[in-house]
Amino acid sequence: MLKSSPLHSASVASGLLKCFLGAHPLLPATYEKCGLTTSCRRSTTIHSPAKIWQPPSCRYFSKSRPILSPLPETSEQSSPSYLSTANKPPGTDEQGLKSDRGDINSDSKSTSKTSRSKKSNVPRSSKSTTQKREKPEKPRELEPWQIQKQALKKKFPEGWNPRKRLHPDTLDTIRHLHQQDPNIYSTPALAQEFKVSPEAIRRILKSKWQPTPEVAAERRERWEKRRKRIWNQLSEIGVRPHRPSFADVSDTKVLEKKRRTVGSK
């Protein structure tokens, strides 16, 4: 066999490579990029003018869509209360915080008051009540005026009427008539005649007080002046004053009546 020379083998290898590359041109990426870029640069430099780089305008950013998509709104942010608070100015937030603090303070005060009222309304322990009930109540001693009041209630069940003020002469007449004949001029008869309670007649008869002659004379003058004044007033009007039944009673007339009754018998 013939030995192939190195030149012949090199030419064969190069021919095979050319054939293979001509049918399927396999060029490296770098070579292809460089070739394309060079051709593009040449074509651009020749056919189209050079473009200078300029910064993008603000309109581009305003018209362009945001790169980051907006976050989804939560339920709290979508609520009307959140929107109203977001639209409020900053001063209103401070006022709202103050009002919230005031509401909290008022709520705490009201709760404290209610707790105090509940404590005050809580009934006391039954021990104190049982101790008070167990102690026997001693009979309270009555004072003298209370004893007298009870006695007067028994004596006057209908109530106490004020004493009728009588003329001093009538008082003397009552005493004198009772001394003359106690059976006829008894206490009920004198009370009915002078329109006074029986107790008042009893006290008049029991009393032994008598005025001095000077006091009696002054009293008579005063009562005489009073009688004349009343009579003059009534006479001016044209009315005759009414005289009670005991006005005609006097010691002499009483004695005369007694004598007549005795003589007739």
UniProtKB/Swiss-Prot annotation:
Originating organism: Blastomyces gilchristii (strain SLH14081) (Blastomyces dermatitidis)
Family: Belongs to the RRG9 family.
UniProt keyword Transmembrane helix present: no
Compartment annotation: Mitochondrion
Record keywords: Mitochondrion, Transit peptide
Ranges of Basic and acidic residues composition bias in the record: 95-106, 131-143
Name under which the protein is recorded: Required for respiratory growth protein 9, mitochondrial
Entry's Gene Ontology cellular component terms: mitochondrion; nucleus
Transit peptide segment: 1-68
Regions of compositional bias (Polar residues) in chain numbering: 72-87
Domain of life, source organism: Eukaryota
Function: Required for respiratory activity and maintenance and expression of the mitochondrial genome.
Lineage of origin: Eukaryota, Fungi, Dikarya, Ascomycota, Pezizomycotina
Region (Disordered): 69-167
Cited InterPro entries: NGRN/Rrg9
ATP-binding keyword on record: no
